[in-house]
Amino acid sequence: MMPKLKEELRTIFNDYGLKYVFDTNSQEIKVMKEKKPGEIFLIPFHSIADTLQRMIFYKAAIESNSKSALVFEEPEAHSYPPFISKVTQDIIQSDRNQFFITTHSPYVVNDFLELPSDKLAIYLVDFRNGETFVKRASDTEVQEMYEYGIDLFFNTETFLR
């Protein structure tokens, strides 16, 4: 596994008194809790919180790809908002890949609105009269979205005219 990702996972799990381990025999990620000296409790990957599973997936995808187009559908789904910012910040800092992200989260959108306009394109999608309608937001509209902040998803009709 990638050293930077390993270290970040160690830090995150350490905050909860847990240790992230990679079982080289089974090739599985596990979480370990030391109950007392010489006694451990192993938690299989599928049993850890959805937020942590998803964060590991997205971070591994970002770090293990280069010169790729990565498509993430609703990375905020089943995740605790503060942890999602750990993923969005990795996306923002990555200059090795191109990203396509669908979201219904104002937290995700607000993180990306910090990007310069030449690094960001926002497309709004609607369903009208049985047809899908897609519109790219202009730079002016993106600036307005930045100013609306959390209210963006309550004002989408403003941008879908």
Language model: regions and residue ranges:
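Conserved D-loop-proximal element of ABC-family nucleotide-binding domains
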Residues: 77-81
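C-terminal lobe/lid and adjacent interdomain/linker elements of RecA-like ASCE P-loop ATPase modules
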Residues: 85-161
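Phosphate-coordinating catalytic segments in nucleotide- and nucleic-acid-processing enzymes
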Residues: 1-65, 69, 128-161
